[in-house]
């Protein structure tokens, strides 16, 4: 009886693990979506770290994070992007790259923040077609006359840092 139970348990284990492996490998659409999403996710994550460094008014950290952003941009495999993402990517990739290079090449906080304006515009255009899994908030500062993107609804202004940390408002929620 004990051997029968062990044999039955082994058979079920093999049956279910084979079925799971088959389901994972025979679903290329699921795999492609995961790859496409991850292609731009690293760009978005790096953008947010640049924004956070600007909030801290840390020009050296901002420069370093912009280098990480540049690495993420160059790592994107265009052939893995969804059609609508690819279309926008082709329109913004040169500007994204130039802005990331510009921010990484200086420790002048004023120049970094000025360049961040156009970096944010390009990132917004891209994230708008990416269907993020979590809400992204487009925020606006009237004093800087500039937008930026945030994962948090609470305003933390990258253009003025601690001197005007909460200046601005949410103008759009991207879902």
Regions from the PLM with identified roles:
Residues 31-175:
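Mature extracytoplasmic or organellar-lumen-exposed domains after removal of signal/transit peptides
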């Amino acid at each position: 009886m004990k051997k029968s139970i062990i044999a039955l348990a082994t058979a079920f284990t093999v049956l279910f693990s084979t079925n799971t492996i088959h389901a994972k490998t025979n679903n290329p659409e699921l795999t492609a979506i995961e790859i496409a999403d991850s292609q731009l996710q690293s760009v978005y994550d790096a953008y947010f770290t640049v924004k956070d460094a600007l909030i801290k008014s840390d020009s050296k950290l901002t420069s370093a994070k912009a280098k990480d952003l540049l690495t993420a941009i160059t790592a994107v495999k265009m052939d893995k992007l969804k059609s609508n993402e690819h279309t926008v990517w082709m329109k913004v990739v040169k500007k994204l790259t130039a802005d990331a290079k510009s921010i990484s090449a200086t420790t002048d906080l004023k120049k970094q923040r000025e360049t961040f304006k156009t970096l944010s515009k390009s990132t917004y255009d891209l994230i708008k077609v990416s269907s993020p899994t979590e809400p992204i908030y487009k925020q606006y500062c009237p004093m800087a006359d500039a937008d930026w993107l945030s994962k948090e609804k609470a305003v933390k202004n990258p253009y003025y840092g601690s001197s005007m940390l909460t200046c601005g408002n949410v103008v759009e929620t991207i879902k």
